[in-house]
């Protein structure tokens, strides 16, 4: 085959450092748009994004020449720098070191889009830690909690 064809859908989750509630309603829409721009620059269109004051969920169609780790390196580095320019309240803004990244099938996209869209309602009764534990169980990923909450 003379061309490379891919469709790699990835559900990505990461939090602010120490799960600090730093993503305010005022900055959230612009942050989401900025995340979309970073993904677009890496030929990895953002299909859905949402979150809470302390974490982000993204559904990304991963580009054929970018790895998940390279995508997240750029997303977290660039958006952290951007956040720090928005207000002195964000001068200490950092993302956590790690992330969760889970492959999903095309048939799961509508359900995941709903899941991402309803983050604030979901977290009225669920912590980020409990959500990540549930996602790891769902996707059969081993979670070592000694390294998961920094």
What are these regions (language model features)?
Residues 1-150:
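Basic nucleic-acid-binding interfaces
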């Amino acid at each position: 085959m003379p061309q490379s064809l891919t469709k790699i859908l990835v559900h990505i989750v990461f939090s602010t450092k120490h799960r600090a509630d730093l993503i305010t309603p005022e900055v959230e829409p612009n942050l989401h748009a900025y995340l979309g721009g970073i993904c677009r620059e890496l030929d990895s269109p953002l299909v859905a994004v949402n979150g809470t004051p302390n974490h982000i969920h993204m559904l990304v169609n991963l580009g054929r020449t970018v790895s998940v780790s390279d995508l997240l390196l750029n997303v977290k580095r660039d958006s952290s720098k951007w956040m720090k320019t928005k207000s002195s309240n964000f001068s200490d803004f950092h993302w956590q070191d790690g992330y969760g990244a889970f492959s999903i099938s095309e048939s799961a996209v509508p359900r995941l889009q709903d899941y991402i869209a309803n983050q604030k309602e979901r977290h009225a009764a669920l912590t980020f830690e409990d959500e990540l534990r549930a996602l790891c169980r769902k996707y059969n990923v081993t979670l070592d909690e000694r390294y998961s909450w920094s």
